Amino acid sequence: MMIQIQDWELSQKIIVVDEINHGTVQVEVPKPGPYKDEYYQFADCAIYNLWVDEKYRKQGSARLLMETAEVEAKKLGCKSVQLEWDDKGSKPFVLEWYQRLGYRIKARNENGRLLLVKEI
């Protein structure tokens, strides 16, 4: 597992890459200030861009990526993490999978996507 922490002007980004199982996930941890707006009203950071190559799916790779991302986010001070899910770009079993990982539906955003939050 390769983990990279990037320091941007308004946030820190965690990039987790599973080179063996061909997957990746990213976390954004906003720095204090005006950028930390209403998007982060329910959590300290956001997980996004979870992806595993199709031929490596359903083998635990995505779970390992998510767990690693959560651990790294916690190291940067996050106590909760959020992610978005929508039925246009993702199948219902993915929402159920997030819920099995401990994510709970918190709200629906202005784009119609569900906002899920987990305490870490």
For every predicted segment, state its role.
Residues 52, 58-71, 96, 100:
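Conserved acetyl-CoA-binding loop-helix of GNAT-fold acetyltransferases
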Residues 30-32, 55, 88:
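Short coil/turn motifs at secondary-structure junctions
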Residues 73-87:
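Conserved GNAT acetyl-CoA-binding A-motif
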Residues 87-108:
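Conserved active-site alpha-helix within GNAT-family acetyltransferase domains
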Residues 48, 53, 86:
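Residue-level recognition of the GNAT/N-acetyltransferase active site
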Residues 108-120:
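Active-site/acyl-donor-binding loops of N-acyltransferases
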